[in-house]
Amino acid sequence: MVPHLITALSGPLLELESKVLEATPTIERWFRLEWQEHTPPFYCSVDLRNSGFKLAPVDTNLFPGGFNNLSPQMLPLAVQAAMAAIEKICPEAKNLLLIPERHTRNTFYLQNIARLSSILRQAGLNVRLGTFSEEIKKPTWIELPDGNRLLMEPLSRLGLKDFDPCSILLNNDLSAGIPPILENLHEQYLLPGLHAGWHIRRKSNHFAAYEEVAKKFAKVVDIDPWMINPYFTSCSNVNFHERKGEEELQTSVEQILKKTAKKYREYGIKDKPYVVVKADAGTYGMGIMVVNDPSQLKDLNRKDRNKMSVVKEGLAVSDVLIQEGVYTFEKVNEAVAEPVVYMIDRYVIGGFYRVHTDRGPDENLNAPGMHFVPLAFEQNSIPDLGAKPGSAPPNRFYLYGVVARLALLAASLELERSDPNAEVTGVPPFAVIVSNVFCCEVSV
């Protein structure tokens, strides 16, 4: 059963909530059967938007970087989920190498690494941190704002008698491409596989897989799949600086706006449809633009064109996703908020609200100035099937967990289809086997 998260929020009645609660036994059995056919990624986070009339994922991250924003109350469940994930991949695992992002000066991100390391250690693993950062030439202690510290070590293909990791866990999304040290490897499990990195992965492929999952799930609970699935399309060969692909992009935006407007009329929704144009690869809230009218794309200023042309690690944008905008009508202390749900293996382990005091309900909240409000578990709570719809927080967050798991299942399908090692028998999906003992350069 998905854990239930505490929140002081209340919202409009969702028909979806009622139908999901009524179908809870069927839904849980459906997920159980799906996980017999598909293997979930080792971990994942999903950004959700709740407009009151629609609840949908807008981003799925296969290298989640906010474990430090989760409530400490979720740690026991996270540890259990990590144990289950590791047991499936490498039951005899003793050592694990964790590879974070290059940026060693972002202490907020490093607090995420500290929390993730703690979870893995409590799951029974000896964890060491290896980095690609050129700044780290030798084992280096990094002090964190909360008083903890991390030992970061340079990576090298060097066998150590006291550290032979069974698995290597990436918390680096490979936006800059595959480092040479990770190429042509065998024998150890690399989680997730290299094909999960942004040098290969595309959001449009994920949402195509999600559309399949949403349609299948909608039949199970008898709902319109649009209630949980944002319309989308994609454009290739776009160059914002040179204004290449501009007409095709405008046409795509217009198509999504028209489809969304038709649904709004069908359900009597008075809000104005909008779309979000975002880089088809990349993360960190970069390369994102809200569009209410296709004509806006003709009048982009230099600042907007620069913003849309390059994302993390200087990755140039040529492919874009055009996604139906989903309003968020949730608030924390009167500030606009959106839930982010975290999972390890197939289990929801917690979540938090991303909050932005200077943004509106139709804007991207993953931007400078955001802050996070952890969601804690409500003790001894299960969905209250007799409660008035929309009135019980456990019911609302059970629903969030269901939709997040649909996105997780979509990620499974997405990675299966892009896995270059799919034909290799005996290899757990989404794990790449690597050779040579791959560990940090110097023993601790």
Predicted regions and their residues:
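Low-complexity, highly charged intrinsically disordered N-terminal segments
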Residues: 1-28, 38, 44-45, 51, ...
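Short Pro/Gly-enriched beta-strand edge/turn motifs at strand-loop
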Residues: 26-36, 318-326
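Conserved metal-phosphate-binding beta-hairpin within the catalytic cores
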Residues: 38-64, 278, 325, 337-346, ...
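Short, flexible loop/turn elements at secondary-structure junctions
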Residues: 47-52, 62-64, 102, 154-156, ...
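Phosphate-binding site of ATP-dependent enzymes
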Residues: 54, 252-262, 267-274, 281-288, ...
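Conserved N-proximal alpha/beta basic substrate-recognition cap immediately N-terminal to
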Residues: 77-81, 104-271
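Conserved catalytic alpha/beta cores of large enzymes that bind or transform nucleotide phosphates
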Residues: 86-103, 368-427
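Conserved hydrophobic helix-helix packing surfaces used for dimerization/oligomerization
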Residues: 95-98, 168, 275
